[in-house]
Amino acid sequence: MTNPSEGTSSSAQSLAYRYTPELANAIEREWQNYWTDKGTFNAPNPVGDLAPEDGRELPGDKLFVQDMFPYPSGAGLHVGHPLGYIATDVFARYNRMLGKNVLHTLGYDAFGLPAEQYAIQTGTHPRTTTMANIENMKRQLGALGLGHDPRRAVASTDPEFYKWTQWIFLQIFNSWFDEEQQKARPISELIPLLESGEIPTRDGADYNGLDRVAKQKAIDEFRLVYRSNSTVNWCPGLGTVLANEEVTADGRSERGNFPVFRKNLSQWMMRITAYSDRLIDDLELLDWPEKVKSMQRNWIGRSRGAEVDFTAEGETITVFTTRPDTLFGATYMVLAPEHELVDVLVSRGTGSYDGVDPRWTNGQATPAEAVAAYRASIAAKSDLERQENKDKTGVFLGVHATNPVNGEQIPVFIADYVLTGYGTGAIMAVPAHDDRDYEFATVFGLPIVEVVAGGNIAEAAYTASGESINSANDQGLDINGLAMVDAVARTIEWLEEKQLGRGTIQYKLRDWLFARQRYWGEPFPVVYDEDGVAYALPESMLPVELPEVEDYKPVSFDPEDADSEPSPPLAKAREWVEVELDLGDGVKKYTRDTNVMPQWAGSSWYQLRYIDPTNDDQFCNLENEAYWTGPRPDVHGPNDPGGVDLYVGGVEHAVLHLLYSRFWHKVLYDLGYVTSKEPYRRLYNQGYIQAFAYTDSRGVYVPAEEVEEKDGKFFYQGEEVTQEYGKMGKSLKNAVAPDDICNNYGADTLRVYEMSMGPLDTSRPWATKDVVGAQRFLQRLWRLIVDENTGEVLTRDEALTDEDNKHLHRTIAGVRDDYANLRVNTVVAKLIEYVNYLTKTYPDTIPTGAVLPLVVMVSPVAPHIAEELWKKLGHTDTVTYEPFPTFEEKWLTDDEVELPVQINGKVRSRITVAADASQEQIIEVALADEKIALQIEGKNLIKQIVIPGRMVNLVVK
C-alpha cells in the first residue's frame, strides 16, 4: 500500500511541525481520504459481490460490530451522539489488529414520524429532507475517522432496502404458528391440515364447506399478520394510531404531545404473542445487561395461574387469576369498560338502579346511561394512566354473577383499572388480599372477606403469603390450612374436575399494532379485491414504492375530536391506490392498502442486510449469514444462539426495537432463512453525554456557550440565570457540534476526550474546557517522535532498559485487557501514564522499540495521528492491520518490592525486599532498618504483621 502523501507535496508537510489543530485537521483529512480510496475497512464475505476477487479463504475468526440504527435528524449531531460510534470503532480497530475479519458499518433509519414531522415543520418533502440529513450525518461522522465499510451502508428509505422489508413482511404474513411444534410454518402447510380436519378452524366450522371468501377468512385467522377490529390508540392531532409504547403515561402522544383516545378500528396486527415463551426463555442465551432482560421479561409479563368461569345472566365470564386459592374471598367482579359482554349483560339486567347504593351509579338513573357516561369519561386515558390512577371509579351493571366455589351472588362492575389487554379483561375482586380491590371496595362499600391468614384487613389488604382460611365448600374443596402453593394447586385441580376452570398461563404482551396512517413509511405489499379479501403481492412486484404526491401531510384533526376517523395520506393518490393486476387468475381490479408500516419495520432486520447489501436475489445469502452471525458453540458455548457479536446503543430501546427485532428474527429462523436464533448475541448500553443548560427568569433557555460564571453564579447578558443539568440538545441551547470540536482541536482529540470521560456504560458531563487535556496528551505523544522545529524523527536504534520493558509490557497487558472489555477510559489513562514515563526518561531521542508498540496501541482510539506517526517511523502500510503488541510475563512482576513499615499503625520507614521473600525474611529486614531500630529500641515487640506485597506493621509497647 502507499501512503497519502507519498510522491506528492502534502499540505500537512507545508504546515509547522507542531501538532496544532491545523496540522491535526490536515493529517485527518488525508488519512480519511486514504482509507476511502484504499477500502481499508472493507470486510470480505464468503460469497457474492463482496467476496474476495482472488478467491482467498476468509479468516475463521470474525467480528460483527454494530451500532443502533441512527435517525438522520434535521438538527444534525451534537457531541453526545458519537459516543457509542467512537467506542465501537475503537473496539473494531482493536480486533482487526488481532487478525479478525471485522464487519463494521452504519446505515440510516429514516422512515417514520421523526422524519415526517421534521419535513412538515420545514415545508419540504420528507424524501428531500431525509437525503439532506443523511448527507449531513455522513459528513459529520466521516470527520470522526470511523472505520466503517461504506459498501454496506443502507438507508431504510431506499426502495432496494425496503423491497426486502416488504418481502419479510410477506413471509410473516404467509406463515402461521404451530402450537405443537412451537414454530412458524408456511401457510401452504396449514391448508392441507384444515382440509383434512387435523386442525379445526378457529370457529369450529367445516373448512371444506366454506365458500372462497369464508375459506380465506378462516386461513387469515391463523396468519402471523392479521387484521383485527380492536381497541387502538387514536391520535387525531397526528392523524394516526399509535402503539401502546408510543403513548405517554398521561395519555398523550410521545411525539407532539397530543391527546390520545381509545377507539375501535380495523388494523394490521402482528402475532408477536405466539412467541411469548420463546422471547422470555431465550433471554437466558444472551449476553445482555440484566436490566434489559428484566425489562423484556416484565413487558412480556408471563403469569401462571387459572382461568375461572363465573356465570351471569346466561353468560360465562372468564377471569384469569394468579391466586385461585383466594376465590372464596371474591366479593364482586369487575370488567373492563370495553369488554364484549358489558352491553349484553346490561341489556339482560334489571335495567334500573332502583334501591341501588348511590355510590354504584355514578349519578345516573340506569346502568345503560351509567356505562355510556363512564366510557366517555375515560376515553382519553392511556392504559398506564388507568392502571396508576389512585382514585377508584366505576359503575354497577345491574347484574350479579355466581362465584363457582361457594355459589355466592356477587355484583358486577366496570372500572378503568381493568384492561382488555391483559388476562381476559375481567377480574374476580378479592379486596382482602389485593390493594386495588381493597381501595375499590372501600369506596363502593363492598364486603371484604379474609381468606389468607396473617394480616389485619381492617386496616389494609394483606398481600403476602399465608395459610388459607375460610376456604371450604361442600363440593369437595377444602384448602384451609394449606400454604399458598398447595392451595393454588388443589383449587386448580378442583376447578378442572368440576369443569369450572383450568390451569393456564397468561401474558401482558399484546400483539403488535403494525400500521400507521402516515405517508413516510414502507407501503404494504397487499391489495384487496372487491370483496375486501387481502392478497399478498408476489415477489416479482416488489418493491411497492411510495408514490410521489404533492400532499403528503397526514389528515390531522382537532386534537380533541375523539370521534374522528383515520384518513391516510396515501388514500389521496387514487392512480396508485386503484390498480389492475394479474395475481394468477387473470387481470382484475384491486385497491392497495393505504396504511404504511411503523418506523420499527426497517430496524427489525437491518443487521441482516449489512451482511449482504448488494444481493439483488435474496435479502441475505445464508452462507454469508452463517459466517457473520451463525452459532459458534466452539467459541461461545454449546447454547450459543448466534447473532451480532456486539450491539451498542441506548437503553431506551430495551423493549420496543429489541423485542420486535427478536420476533422477526425468530420467524426467519423458523422458516430457514437464517441460522442464528437471535439477532444480537451481545448487547452493550452506553451512557450519555450530558451538559449544563441555563434558563432565564421566564424559564426560557439561553445559549449555554454565552453564559458567564461569577462568584458561583451564572449570568447571560448581565442577567442572572438558573443552571440545570441533564440532556444535551438543540432545544436546550446547550448542544455542542462535533464539527466545532474537530475544527478547533482535531477529531483524534475529540475521540480521546470522549473515551476518557469515564466508563462507557455511565453518563458523564461534557466540558469543552477539558478537551484541551486530550489535546495535550496527543501533543506529548507527537513530541516524543517528531522534532517540532525540523520535523525529524527522534528515534534511535537502542535496546530498552529493564525499566523501559517493565513500563512497556505492563502497559501492553493492561491496554489489551481494557480494549477487549470496552474500558477505553482506562486505556487512555494507561497510555497517558506510559507517554509521561517516556517523556521524562527520554527528553531528546528515544529508542524505536519504546514507541513502535505505543503507536499501535494508540491507533484504535486516535487513528489519524497513529497513521501519521507510523508512516514517519518508516512504514509504507497502514497501521490498521498491524498485529497488536503482545507482552512477556516476566516483565509484569518485580524482582524486588518496596514495602512501608508501620509501628502501631503509623508509617515510620520503607524497606526493599525480594518479591518472593518469606515473611520471616521481611521481618528480619524491617527490624534491621535503622529508622525502625531506633523507634522500637527499649520497647516490647508485641506483634508482627506482614501483608504480602503491601505492608509490614509492628505493634510495640
UniProtKB/Swiss-Prot annotation:
Q: Which reaction does it catalyse?
A: tRNA(Leu) + L-leucine + ATP = L-leucyl-tRNA(Leu) + AMP + diphosphate
* Entry EC number(s): 6.1.1.4
Name the keywords, alphabetized: Aminoacyl-tRNA synthetase, ATP-binding, Cytoplasm, Ligase, Nucleotide-binding, Protein biosynthesis
This protein's GO cellular component annotations are: cytosol
Q: Which GO terms describe its molecular function?
A: aminoacyl-tRNA deacylase activity; ATP binding; leucine-tRNA ligase activity
Which InterPro entries does the UniProt record give? Answer: aa-tRNA-synth_I_CS (IPR001412), Leu-tRNA-ligase (IPR002302), Leu_tRNA-synth_edit (IPR025709), M/V/L/I-tRNA-synth_anticd-bd (IPR013155), Methionyl/Leucyl_tRNA_Synth (IPR015413), Rossmann-like_a/b/a_fold (IPR014729), tRNAsynth_Ia_anticodon-bd (IPR009080), Val/Leu/Ile-tRNA-synth_edit (IPR009008)
Q: Where is this motif: 'HIGH' region?
A: 70-81
Task: Give the PROSITE patterns listed for this entry.
Answer: AA_TRNA_LIGASE_I
- Please indicate if the UniProt record lists Cytoplasm as a keyword: yes
- Kindly list the places in or outside the cell where this protein is found, as annotated in its UniProt entry: Cytoplasm
Q: Which GO terms describe its biological process?
A: leucyl-tRNA aminoacylation
Q: Where would I look for the motif 'KMSKS' region in this sequence?
A: 727-731
Q: List ligand-binding residues for ATP.
A: K730
**Homology family:** Belongs to the class-I aminoacyl-tRNA synthetase family.
HAMAP family per UniProt: Leu_tRNA_synth_B
Q: Which PANTHER family match?
A: LEUCINE--TRNA LIGASE, MITOCHONDRIAL, LEUCYL-TRNA SYNTHETASE
Q: What is this protein called?
A: Leucine--tRNA ligase
Q: Gene name?
A: leuS
